Amino acid sequence: MGFERLSTNLVCQRAGLTPPALYRYFPNKYAILSELGRRLMDAQDRAVFDWIEAGGLVADSMDEAIAKNREIQETVNQITRDMPGGVWILRAMRAVPMLQDIRIASRDKVARHTAERLLEQYPASSTEEIYAATRITTELMMAATEMVLEQPDADEALVTQEVCRMVCLYYSQFAGGKTRYNL
């Protein structure tokens, strides 16, 4: 079923609710999708923050950095896959203008948090450059998630490996010759 066919009546039918009960909390299908989108983004964000706090941004080699990034990318993919309607929620957040702010706010929240941690590790780096880099790479990782979930014929392991390699190679510029590779 496509997003266009989603209706509050269909939601009521599937959820076992009456329309008045649903309308008490949600005035329309966009409000429902907004809440579902927030829940999905919050779950993904929590996973990324936990990964960062567990040392996800710190590695002693490029291979370790790629492996750590692959771990969080696979986790985010699985969170989306496990949420009922997760792929459809992602599609709606990209396609429906009134839902795009939820996705963008999530991206920027993750990017800010990541940038703060990277600036602690690379204090000589430009705040603006690090923040731009984290926004770009967060968006890239989100696009890779969408690609593998929306296109079942895509080789998920290969797409995940390659996006993680791209991100790690990009971030190695901030290491400035150090032996540590972050993000």
What are the residue ranges of the model-derived segments?
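Short secondary-structure transition hinges
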Residues: 58-68, 81-110
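Hydrophobic alpha-helical connector segments
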Residues: 35, 49-81
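Helix-turn-helix
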Residues: 1-31, 35
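Secondary-structure edge/capping motif, primarily at the C-terminal ends of alpha-helices
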Residues: 48-59, 84-94, 121, 148-152
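Alpha-helical DNA-contacting segments of helix-turn-helix folds
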Residues: 33-43, 106
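Hydrophobic/aromatic-rich alpha-helical bundle segments in the mid-to-C-terminal region
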Residues: 100, 118-167, 178-183
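An amphipathic alpha-helix signature
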Residues: 66, 70, 74, 108-115, ...
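N-terminal hydrophobic signal/anchor transmembrane helix of membrane proteins
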Residues: 43-46, 69-81, 136-139, 163-181
